[in-house]
């Protein structure tokens, strides 16, 4: 059987951007943890457009690490793109994701897999004692609090890179933009069983963190996208219709007021407030029309494509 067709028990997917200094040690630790488990496994490193010679090192490391596979991007496409490519190439029944900076401990892999064996489909790590700078810790806590309260999925650490997935989960998820932050939420909405366990978090040994304020802001914007897609996917008219009705009600109220003024006074001049009422009614009609068009688009697609079937007889 060709290598590309061989199934594995376990795939480890590692997005890497300018993490050359940590790659050799990370692979050594992974082999040391996984080999005693007696599992067939592969390690897929996605070089996300690194400028530090990571790909050259990965070519060398393939000679001493038979389980290693790597993909080199032409440029930096982001963590979501790296995970999507890794998921598409994974052959394992279980897929582990982790960061390449040695802050995620490979020794946690058996615990993650044991939790999957309890019947869960996705197990997310919870960095209970983070070894990150104060600003990164604070923004991460705020992000996780807002996400947990908005989404209805109670997790402490949505963005932990260390996660375990059943293969059917990675095959079902669409990862793009900054959606890697919300994979537990997306899986939960699709009906998969999601949980978390505390994991050790190590101080960064090499390089610099890729965290920035823009990533936090982008993540919050993507949260609105996720909430809209998960809650209004099957009936977008409910969302656009409510917005349209709100504008329409306000605009109609203004126009009715001026109608009674006209009845009472017998004359009515064109006033800015009346123009606002007319404009609000037109905006309401546009929102409702947009909702109807979105409904037609949803109806034209296979509406069962997002339904996950656990079993059938």
What are these model-derived regions, one by one?
Residues 60, 71-75, 79-89, 94-97, ...:
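Acceptor/aglycone-binding surface of glycosyltransferases and processive sugar-polymer synthases
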Residues 9-11, 42:
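Cell-envelope/extracellular polymer assembly enzymes that use nucleotide-activated donors
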Residues 21-25, 52-61:
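Acidic helix N-cap motif at the loop->helix transition within catalytic regions
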Residues 2-6, 178, 182-313:
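Hydrophobic helical membrane-anchoring modules
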Residues 19-22, 50, 79, 105:
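Donor nucleotide-sugar binding loop of glycosyltransferases
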Residues 47-56, 102-103:
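A conserved acidic beta->alpha catalytic loop
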Residues 39-50, 71-72:
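Short beta-strand/loop segment that forms part of the nucleotide-sugar
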Residues 19-34:
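Short, well-formed alpha-helical segments that are part of the catalytic scaffolds
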């Amino acid at each position: 059987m060709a290598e590309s067709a061989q199934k594995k028990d376990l795939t480890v997917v590692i997005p890497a951007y300018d993490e050359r200094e940590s790659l050799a040690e990370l692979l050594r630790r992974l082999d040391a943890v996984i080999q005693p488990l007696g599992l067939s496994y592969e390690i897929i490193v996605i070089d996300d457009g690194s400028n530090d010679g990571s790909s050259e090192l990965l070519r060398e490391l393939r000679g001493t690490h038979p389980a290693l596979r790597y993909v080199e991007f032409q440029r930096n496409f982001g963590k979501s793109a790296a995970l999507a490519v890794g998921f598409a190439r994974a052959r394992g029944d279980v897929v582990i994701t982790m960061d390449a900076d040695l802050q995620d401990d490979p020794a946690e892999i058996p615990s993650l897999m044991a939790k999957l064996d309890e019947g869960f489909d996705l197990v997310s790590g919870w960095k209970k004692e983070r070894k990150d700078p104060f600003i990164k810790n604070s923004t991460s806590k705020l992000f996780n609090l807002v996400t947990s309260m908005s989404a209805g999925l109670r997790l402490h650490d949505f963005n932990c890179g260390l996660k375990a997935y059943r293969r059917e989960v990675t095959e079902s998820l669409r990862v793009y933009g900054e959606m890697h932050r919300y994979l537990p939420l997306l899986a939960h909405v699709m009906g998969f069983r999601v949980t978390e366990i505390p994991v050790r978090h190590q101080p960064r040994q090499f390089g610099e963190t890729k965290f920035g304020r823009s990533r936090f802001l982008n993540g919050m914007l993507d949260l609105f996208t996720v909430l809209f897609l998960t809650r209004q996917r099957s009936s977008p008219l409910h969302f656009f219709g409510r917005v349209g009705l709100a504008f329409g009600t306000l605009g109609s109220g203004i126009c009715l007021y001026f109608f009674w003024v006209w009845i009472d006074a017998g004359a009515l001049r064109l006033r800015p407030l009346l123009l606002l009422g007319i404009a609000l009614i037109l905006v309401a009609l546009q929102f409702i029309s947009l909702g109807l068009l979105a409904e037609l688009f949803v109806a034209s697609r296979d509406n069962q494509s997002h339904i996950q079937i656990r079993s059938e007889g």
